[in-house]
Amino acid sequence: MRWLIAPPLRRFVALAALASLLLNLALLMPSLYTLQVFDRVFASRSIETLAMLSALTLLALAFGYCMDVVRARALAAAGHTLMERLSPPALEQALLRAAGAGTRNGVDRVRDVAQLNQFLHGNGVRALFDAPWLPIYLGVIALMHPWLGITAALGAAALATIAVAAERLTRERTDALTQRARAVGRHAEALVRHAEAFVGLGMVGNALAAWRRQHAHWLDQQGHLGSTSARLSALARMARQGVQMAVLGVGALLVVGADASPGIMVAATILLGRALQPVEQLIAGWKQLLDARGAWRRLCEPGSAPRSSASLRLPAPIGRLAVERVVFGHDPQRPALLKGVSFTLAAGESLGLIGASGSGKTTLARLLLGLRTPRSGSVRLDDADIAQWNRHELGPHLGYLPQEVAFFDATVAQNIARLGAVDDAAVIRAAQLAQAHEVILRLPQGYDTMLGDAGIALSGGQRQRIALARALHGAPKLVVLDEPDAHLDAEGEAALKAALRMLKGNGATVIVVGHRAGLMAQLDTIAVLKDGTLQAIGPA
């Protein structure tokens, strides 16, 4: 649990530790109260002594309550700090992984951060702070009588053995169950994401059957782990009760032999119950402890932190592009998808990428934007490797229209502005450049129409034009359009051609992935890809 003493959390954890110290000191009072009542009050029959002891004990318990609240708030503040520090980079890494490798499990890192925060709000972390007090409690019991201390120590060792067994029996299965649960969740998300195809093709039954098999396997794993945890938890409860009975029995023998007072017998039993309670809680919540530890381990894995961008701020690009012997493939053990591709474009030039499906056009388009990292070779924008650019600074100078258009849960204007501050003039200028202004005005609320999952349903042509406007927002210097003529009718295709001419007039470097000869005729150069190699390149 080294993450608990990470520098951002250290002051909160230190405060929680101090509060735990004072809390456990306060919780010694009930045992001392019992001892004094049996040994002093009963012997002296003094009401004043009883009243004073009761008042002191109530005061100690009130103080303990305050310290428990302080500890809870300190741990909650630690969780808040953890979420603030780790959630944004975890989400950024999820976005980069999804864009760079096409994987959607990067969001699991965000869930891992939430798992740590949940642990800091649970009972398991409190038990961690209380468990170190076990030796001190055992020492106090031993001071009451050595045999009571020995009996209590043996009982604590038995509970510690159960805790070790819980670690060994549940650690690997807990990690596997977490991964399985997330896989089941991703499977369900994929079904919902492609619902139209499943329903349209009558695949709902088969899709549900496949998901049900995966879900059933997860339920079986969960049941086995839950059964093991329940048995260990029940064993810990019975062991604690047994240890308390043993201490009570040994205390009774000592009382009968006149080696201890009844007050010592009862006080030792109460104190032992308090000492063993956090150990029992740790065993009962061992899964939460392992979940938190696994979450931190995954967050510390290589590649879990966002790739650092260049610290030196480069000047705004003018759009000069150079692709030098680029080789790319997802799996080093399989043939590369792109093999030694090279070409250059001066600022303001345009290039059309054509080729059969699977030839590598879309992969190359993503490489040009820095969404993929080549195995060898380089993609240079204004002589700087695309990886050297700060993504946040470079983004406004790039325009991208992917094959699969997606909009955020925001207005049309906010989507075109890329979720940044909406400059009305810039948004309208981008829409006009994409020939989408009139299309947007015909929507129910115009530029204020909501898009995304909770927004209006758009036709394919409407989506394509608004997405093109988003790509052109801010007068980008490098524009990559992946099959921008998809879903467009004759009017939309004419608008796209006009947009390409305006981009050329504005000095933007444009790369278009497409098939139609009419669209390619608007460009300066055509490159033909086949099986990942550049077969030919020349004037359009």
Task: Enumerate the language-model features and the residues they cover.
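An intracellular "coupling" helix at the cytosolic face of ABC transporter transmembrane type-1 domains
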Residues: 7-11, 99, 111-120, 124, ...
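Conserved signature/switch motifs of ABC ATPase nucleotide-binding domains
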Residues: 474, 506
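Hydrophobic alpha-helical segments in the permease module
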Residues: 56-68, 155-158, 233-243, 262-284
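ABC ATPase nucleotide-binding domain helical subdomain, centered on the C-loop/LSGGQ "ABC signature"
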Residues: 413-453, 497-498, 502
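Membrane-integrated ABC transporters
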Residues: 1-29, 43, 47-53, 71, ...
